[in-house]
Curated annotation (Swiss-Prot):
Coiled coil: none
Keyword Ribosomal protein: yes
HAMAP family registered for this protein in UniProt: Ribosomal_uL11
Keywords: Ribonucleoprotein, Ribosomal protein, RNA-binding, rRNA-binding
The species this protein was found in: Hyperthermus butylicus (strain DSM 5456 / JCM 9403 / PLM1-5)
Protein name: Large ribosomal subunit protein uL11
Pfam families, A to Z: Ribosomal_L11, Ribosomal_L11_N
Any GO CC annotation of this UniProt entry: large ribosomal subunit
Length: 168
């Protein structure tokens, strides 16, 4: 006996104590309802998205750890603008517009999977993704918004989210 890993996809905050999850958990001698409850807590902030969950179980102690892989940046951006797919021609055909604050919120959600050390760097990454799929930000090309972020024009907005970034 050692470490067992179970990989599943669940809708954020909506895992159910049913197959394929329940039998795999039961087989390891864990309380299915408790594990599902913990998975739902861990995935709650991704409500409406399908996320990959890795359940790492120590078969000896029955202790477990839950790792959640957040949705892709593209998925988060598309859902935010209500689009089903990226623009085929993002420079000329826009699929939607988002407020800068929404870009910041997505950056915070993506923190675990981004290599960004600061909120400002994470926001610039998300702005690049928005541009590549045809989304404008506050009615502007995300490239322009990125320049404005670098110039400090959004520092006050970013400061409001700094604490949330640190906790993420």
């Amino acid at each position: 006996m050692g470490i067992r890993v179970i990989n599943v996809k669940v809708r954020g905050g909506e895992a159910k104590p049913a197959p394929p999850l329940a039998p795999a958990i039961e087989k390891l001698g864990l309380d299915v309802n408790k594990v599902v409850e913990d998975i739902n807590k861990a995935t709650e902030k991704y409500k409406g998205f399908e996320v990959a969950v890795k359940l790492i179980v120590d078969e000896n102690t029955k202790e477990y750890e839950i790792e959640v892989k957040p949705p892709t940046t593209t998925e988060l951006l598309l859902k935010a603008v209500g689009a089903s797919e990226p623009s085929g021609d993002p420079m000329h055909q826009k699929i939607g517009d988002l407020p800068f604050e929404k870009i910041v919120e997505i950056a915070i959600l993506k923190k675990p999977s981004l290599n960004a050390k600061t909120l400002k760097a994470a926001v610039k990454t998300i702005l690049g993704s928005a541009r590549s799929i045809g989304i404008t930000v506050d009615g502007k090309d995300p490239k322009q918004v990125t320049k404005e972020v670098e110039e400090g024009l959004y520092d006050a907005v970013l400061a409001k989210y700094e604490e949330e970034w640190e906790k993420a």
